[in-house]
């Protein structure tokens, strides 16, 4: 597929990811259409002159564009991606357990892309009928394209954590608020989830 659709205008980080991938795809020769979810009807109107049947694909994040938005559905509830035979490559950056309601009604030519091997294992176990892959490990933006950054071996810290992390103490008051049996029950759930994440 030489023509690719990306979304912006909804969640800032996912718009940023889309623009970064779109830029890289343009550098290797793809045509790109940036669909602005904050202006859906105007974007849809501009999309159709760009669209080429059999040569256009959607690359999106976390089910944007396939989560029931009315401007992507026809009068029968058919998704635009199905009506136009557009394959969709959905990069899911959160655990798929949050998206069961979307996974049960994906477009026909849907490809689920995981960023975590355990998410991928979860998909194989609970949604084997869905095309899973290719795996896409996390990446980043080059802050120093001129390579002026400090090499890893000379850095003060050798690990960087990017994401949402809350120390257990944040939740401790909720876990231990009733009695020992209640506390043991919740710690047991945490231990089980850590031992069996999928």
Model-assigned labels for residue ranges:
Residues 8-17, 129-198:
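Nucleotide-sugar donor-binding catalytic core of glycosyltransferases
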Residues 7, 14-126, 142-147:
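Extended catalytic core of nucleotide-activated donor transferases of GT-like folds
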Residues 1-5:
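Extreme N-terminal starter segment of soluble prokaryotic enzymes
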């Amino acid at each position: 597929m030489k023509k690719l659709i990306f979304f912006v205008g909804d969640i800032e980080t996912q718009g940023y990811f889309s623009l970064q991938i779109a830029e890289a795809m343009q550098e290797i020769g793809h045509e790109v259409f940036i669909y602005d979810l904050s202006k859906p009807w105007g974007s849809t109107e501009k999309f159709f002159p760009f669209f080429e049947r059999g040569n256009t694909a959607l690359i999106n994040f976390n089910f944007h564009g396939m989560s029931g938005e009315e401007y992507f559905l026809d009068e029968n509830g058919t998704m635009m991606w199905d009506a136009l035979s557009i394959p969709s490559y959905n990069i899911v950056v959160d655990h798929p357990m949050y998206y069961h309601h979307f996974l049960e009604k994906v477009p026909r030519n849907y490809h689920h892309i995981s960023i975590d091997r355990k998410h991928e294992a979860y998909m194989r176990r609970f949604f084997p009928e869905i095309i899973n892959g290719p795996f896409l490990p996390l990446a980043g933006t080059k802050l120093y394209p001129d390579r002026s950054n400090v090499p890893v071996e000379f850095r003060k810290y050798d690990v960087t954590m990017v994401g949402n992390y809350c120390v257990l103490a944040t939740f401790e008051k909720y876990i231990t608020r009733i009695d020992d049996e209640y506390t043991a029950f919740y710690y047991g759930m945490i231990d089980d989830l850590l031992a069996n994440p999928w």
